[in-house]
From Swiss-Prot:
GO biological process: actin cytoskeleton organization
Region (Disordered): 1-47, 98-253, 295-483
Biased composition (Low complexity): 162-176
Molecular function per GO: actin binding; protein phosphatase inhibitor activity
Self-association state and partner proteins as the record states: Binds PPP1CA and actin.
Species for this entry: Rattus norvegicus (Rat)
Name of protein: Phosphatase and actin regulator 2
Record PTM Phosphothreonine, positions in chain: T36
Length: 569
């Protein structure tokens, strides 16, 4: 489940710690002395266009969601149990070994190696070419390996984790050339992988590969055969094509490094290496097999085909982050069959075959990034993440094409859904619809008919309803006669009304037939308010008169005189 990195021969390998790895992964471009072509950089004016395209603003949220998903996957992978533990608990079958000297290296959930078989032969074979400061595959003790990976994993940025494979950053440790600037190890340079066939590597000495003894060749080819037949190689890494190009440049055969994918609990996913720019990276998390001078391994055995042992489809890849999408383009077509590689195990890739097959292992650069937006094989469901930079470039180039493509995609998904709808026969087979014959349908109709007839026969007839006076019989002649009778009755009542003289004679009406009319002037009909017209002098005179009247003329009892109220003068 870890990241796969392969080491080639280097004059002075130096280990890169986690801090350097973080700076390498975050670097935007290649150094000055690198042989990689320059990256496709977007101009400064392309970012200004985003201001006028509000429908693209929502794309910034994808990276946050992707980072959270990566953290969750990292936590889950760190707690995953090893293969030995699962075999011990009986959840996995142990694969039988074909040869006695086969060395199969599995990795557990943390990216560490679990060595099964004879580890001494593996270390001996790897240790032989280490003469004159040349290392093919630096392989220390497991404790040193674990400590090194822990330090690397703690400082590895989360940007380079794109899926379950890339979300365990402690899975790879690199060694670089003694040159000053470091090349980017992640797949941020998307165009580098596609031009891998043109790249020539001239920094490794050509004589280092010839130091491998014939014993090393035979043991390694037999171990290759055993490992390929036992575990089933799922991918041939792009670094092998680099080694082939190196052989063509130097004219001498060199060691081809085949990285075997880790065997994990199903559902299994294909091995997902991040293509390194530097050919001298060291794989500490995947088993390494060195193949050298011997029979040739044909390219036809390495063509893409599904693995019979796995349940996943062969074309199923995992989404990479925006920095690792370029690397996935080389690895999308690198799945091999278990049977084909099991038969062709002891053979080798000759320089001519490797040179001819460079084009077959590099995917075209103009492939849409949507092809690599696939489901993750973990049980948490898909990580829906696409490369925002590539999408923005595509949208800037052809907005109409993307709209048309999305419309076609919508129609395709609708057609797929309609095509997946089960037929009537399938529903009957699944016992969702009851299977009925023509006779059964006829019987059902007859039952419904008899039930309706029985209900209708229980309804009362019109005669019964008329007898109960519920339904009245309607006749036009009778209706006309009823109307005429009503008119006659009303006219009779009106004819019996007394006349006005009769009412006057009975003194019921008392009024004069003639009315006298007189003219009168208009006047104010409002109430009269004399106090509103009194002057203050008038009011003072009234108060004085009242006081005199109360004091002299009004009869008041002597004991109650003190209670007599006088007005103010």
């Amino acid at each position: 489940m870890g990241q796969t990195s392969v080491s080639a021969l280097s004059p002075q390998p130096g280990s890169v710690d986690g801090l350097d790895k973080a700076s390498i992964a975050n670097s935007d471009g290649p150094p000055a002395g690198s042989q990689t072509p320059p990256f496709k950089r977007k101009g400064k004016l392309s970012t200004i266009g985003k201001i006028f395209k509000p429908w693209k603003w929502r794309k910034e949220k994808t990276s946050d969601k992707f980072r959270e998903t990566s953290a969750v996957l990292e936590r889950k992978i760190s707690t995953r149990q090893s293969r030995e533990e699962l075999i011990r608990r009986g959840l996995l079958k142990e694969l039988p070994d074909q040869d006695g000297d086969v060395t199969v290296n599995f990795e557990n959930s943390n990216g560490h190696m679990i060595h099964i078989g004879e580890e001494a032969t593996q270390e001996e074979n790897v240790g032989k070419p280490e003469e004159g400061n040349v290392s093919v595959c630096e392989k220390g003790p497991p404790r040193e390996e674990q400590a090194e990976e822990k330090t690397a994993g703690s400082s590895h940025p989360k940007k380079t984790t794109g899926s379950k494979a890339s979300s365990s950053p402690s899975a790879s440790s690199t060694s670089s050339h003694p040159r000053g600037p470091k090349e980017s190890l992640t797949g941020k340079a998307g165009a580098v992988g596609t031009t891998r066939g043109k790249k020539k590597i001239s920094k490794q000495p050509a004589a280092a590969a010839s130091r491998l003894s014939p014993n090393t060749v035979t043991s390694e080819t037999s171990s290759l055969k055993g490992e390929l037949s036992d575990t089933g190689v799922e991918s041939l890494k792009p670094e092998e094509t680099v080694a082939g190009a190196e052989e063509e440049a130097t004219g001498k055969p060199k060691a081809v490094v085949v990285a075997l994918p880790p065997v994990t609990v199903p559902p299994s996913s294909p091995a997902l290496p991040l293509p390194p720019e530097d050919p001298c990276t060291i794989a500490l998390d995947t088993p390494m097999v060195l193949v050298s001078d011997g029979p040739t391994l044909p390219i036809s055995a390495l063509e893409t085909s599904p693995l019979p042992g796995t349940e996943e489809p062969a074309n199923r890849t995992t989404p990479y982050s925006s920095t690792g999408l370029g690397g996935s383009r080389e690895q999308a077509k690198c799945f091999t069959t278990k049977d084909g590689l099991g038969k062709a195990g002891p053979q080798l890739l000759t320089p001519g075959q490797m040179g001819d097959s460079l084009e077959s292992f590099s995917a075209p650069e103009d492939e849409a990034p949507r092809e690599y937006q696939a489901n993750d094989s973990d049980s948490d469901g898909p990580i829906l993440y696409t490369d925002d930079d590539d999408e923005e470039d595509d949208d800037d180039d052809s907005t109409g094409e993307s709209a048309l493509a999305s419309k076609i995609r919508r129609r395709d998904t609708l057609a797929i859904k309609l095509g997946n709808r089960p037929s009537k026969k399938e529903l009957e087979d699944k016992n969702i619809l009851q299977r009925t014959s023509e006779e059964e349908r006829q019987e059902l109709r007859q039952q419904i008919g008899t039930k309706l007839v029985r209900r209708l026969s229980q309804r009362p007839t019109t005669e019964e309803l008329e007898q109960r006076s519920i339904l009245k019989q309607k006749n036009e002649e009778e209706e006309q006669e009823a109307k005429m009778e009503l008119k006659r009755r009303l006219s009779r009542k009106l004819s019996l009304r007394p006349t006005v003289p009769e009412l006057q004679a009975r003194r019921i009406l008392r009024f004069n037939e003639y009315v006298e009319v007189t003219d009168s002037p208009d006047y104010d009909r409002r109430a009269d308010k004399p106090w509103a017209r009194l002057t203050p002098a008038d009011k003072a005179a009234i108060r004085k008169e009242l006081n005199e009247f109360k004091s002299t003329e009004m009869e008041v009892h002597e004991e109650s005189r003190q209670f007599t109220r006088f007005h103010r003068p």
